[in-house]
A protein has these predicted regions:
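Short S/T/G/P-rich N-terminal loop/turn motif that feeds into the first structured element of a domain
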Residues: 1-35, 39-41, 48, 63, ...
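Amphipathic, hydrophobic secondary-structure cores in small proteins
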Residues: 45-55
Length: 108
């Protein structure tokens, strides 16, 4: 399964809801992910009011997650980016090295 980094900023109304009804957001997020056949790898909050999580699943599910989160109205500035292990970069570098001479930049 692919992994995705999801970030978002809570709205003021979301903060009001959490202050008026303290609860574990991981449980609520887990329900959405389960419905999308995704897994929560890690969930973090920042002091600046941002949500940061790593999830695994399909690209289709990740796209759906973006729509569901946006439609909720409780978060803004949502990003969903596929992430890779740093070790994967070696393969990318080797592949790039093999084709560098074949590419002619537009400004050349």
């Amino acid at each position: 399964m692919a992994q995705f980094m999801v970030t978002a900023a809570y709205t003021d109304s979301a903060f009001a809801g959490m202050a008026n009804n303290p609860h574990n957001r991981e449980e609520a997020i887990g329900k959405i992910l389960s419905a999308l056949n995704m897994n929560l790898e890690s969930l973090h909050m920042t002091l600046g009011g941002k949500l940061f999580m790593v999830v695994s699943g399909s690209a289709e599910a990740a796209g759906s997650l973006r729509i569901v989160a946006g439609a909720s109205g409780s978060v803004t500035d949502i990003t969903v980016d596929e992430v890779f292990l740093a070790a994967d970069q070696v393969d990318w570098m080797q592949s790039a090295s093999a084709v560098m001479g074949a590419y002619k930049p537009a400004n050349a």
